[in-house]
């Protein structure tokens, strides 16, 4: 039998400190940005959600949505694995070429999130530049702070 007491204590401490996370259950309404539907514990409410990472509204753009449907019809859903193991989706390769062209570089690389891009940029820099020093403070994004530590 597993002793759950240590885990329960950590959870209780997080709740007391106000650091226990409860994730909002929402549905974004396509074509009605920034409105969403929030599924709360006691009610369902219409809300305005300005916290989305869809800064440019590309997730609402008909051309983007149509392209996604085409890709889904051709390849199905899901990545099929990491690029290193299962290969890289042709759509990702095409997007990387387009981004490189847009920014006038020889190549581009997609990451799953800005957090991961920040982390691995620091890893690459620290491997390429011997004795590099990173200066940071608590105002930096946690992706930078955690990797610098």
Task: Locate the predicted segments by residue.
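Active-site-proximal alpha-helical scaffold in enzymes
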Residues: 100, 119-127
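Short coil/turn connectors at secondary-structure junctions
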Residues: 44, 104-106, 129-132
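N-terminal "arm"/small-domain region of PLP-dependent enzymes with the aminotransferase-like
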Residues: 2-6, 12, 16-75
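Conserved N-terminal alpha-helix of the aminotransferase class I/II PLP-enzyme fold
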Residues: 65-113
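Short glycine/serine/threonine-rich phosphate/pyrophosphate-binding segments
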Residues: 110, 115-121, 142-144
């Amino acid at each position: 039998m597993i002793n759950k007491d240590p885990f329960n204590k950590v959870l209780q401490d997080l709740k007391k400190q106000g650091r226990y996370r409860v994730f909002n259950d929402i549905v974004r309404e396509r074509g009605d940005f920034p409105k969403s539907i929030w599924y709360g514990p006691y009610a369902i409410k219409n809300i305005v959600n300005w916290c989305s990472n869809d800064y440019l509204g590309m997730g609402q753009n008909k051309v983007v949505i149509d392209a996604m449907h085409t890709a889904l019809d051709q390849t199905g859903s899901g990545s099929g694995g990491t690029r290193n193991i299962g290969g890289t989706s042709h759509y990702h390769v095409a997007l990387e070429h387009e981004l490189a062209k847009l920014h006038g570089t020889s190549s581009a690389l997609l990451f799953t999130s800005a957090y991961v891009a920040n982390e691995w940029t620091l890893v690459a820099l620290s491997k390429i530049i011997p004795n590099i020093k990173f200066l940071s403070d608590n105002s930096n994004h946690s992706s930078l702070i955690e990797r610098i530590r």
